[in-house]
Structure formats: structure tokens, C-alpha cells
């Protein structure tokens, strides 16, 4: 069976990332990659366009890394205070989620709640937390839970 060179437009498991030129079976390209919008046929003109996209992506990665370093300087070692309803014994009604922590952090820096790592919080007190700002950069901070 003949192979066809394609340029990926999105990440495909076991194949590559956007902008990669890969050789795949013709049927796989025609029946899956092209209809799903995951790739388009390789050509010299398209290859030049992809190189420009890769350079732009690299420049963007450098910019986001610089933003992550700036955000780390703001977040590192700081304390975020969250007020929650508490029972008489000091336990929370519910818990403190990563979403609530992200909302509290938004006064300093916007972060994705999925990037926040914290142990389950069920009582008042200070708790360590970590946020991944970039694949190479993380910031440690504290979450202070107080009674409402």
C-alpha cells in the first residue's frame, strides 16, 4: 500500500504534533486524517508555510515562558485567603476546590484550575499548594482557609 506525506494540523496520538510532516498509509489519510481536519496533504508550498508556523509557535513559547516567570515572582510564597462556612467543630461544609483557589488567585494572576495541585482541604488553616504555570515552571504558595 502506498504511503502519503501529510502535515498535521492537530496533535494525533502516536503520530505527532501540529506542523509535523509524517508519512501515513493513503487510506488512513484519506479516510480519517483529512475528514477529521487533523492533517492536509504535503506540498512544497505547504511545507514552507509550516516552517513559518513552527517559528511563530517557538516565539510564542518563549513569550509564555517569560510570562510564567513573571507570574511565578508574583505567586511564589504568597498566601491566598479563602473564607468558607465552617461547623462548630472547625470542619468545612464541603471543601475548597482548585476552582475556588483559582478565583482567589485571579486578583494576582489568572491561572487554570487544572494546573493547581493541593491536598483535599476539609478544615480551616494554612495549606501548601502548587500551580504549574509552564511545563518547566511551578510556583508554591499557601491557601489560608478562614471561617466565614
Swiss-Prot record:
Pfam families: Ribosomal_L9_C, Ribosomal_L9_N. Gene3D superfamilies: Ribosomal protein L9, C-terminal domain (3.10.430.100), Ribosomal protein L9, N-terminal domain (3.40.5.10). One of its GO terms (molecular function) is rRNA binding. GO terms for cellular component: ribonucleoprotein complex; ribosome. The keyword RNA-binding applies. GO terms for biological process: translation. Transmembrane segments: none annotated. Binds to the 23S rRNA. NCBIfam families: L9 (TIGR00158). HAMAP family: Ribosomal_bL9. PANTHER family: 50S RIBOSOMAL PROTEIN L9. This is Large ribosomal subunit protein bL9. It comes from Bifidobacterium adolescentis (strain ATCC 15703 / DSM 20083 / NCTC 11814 / E194a). The lineage of its organism: Bacteria, Bacillati, Actinomycetota, Actinomycetes, Bifidobacteriales.
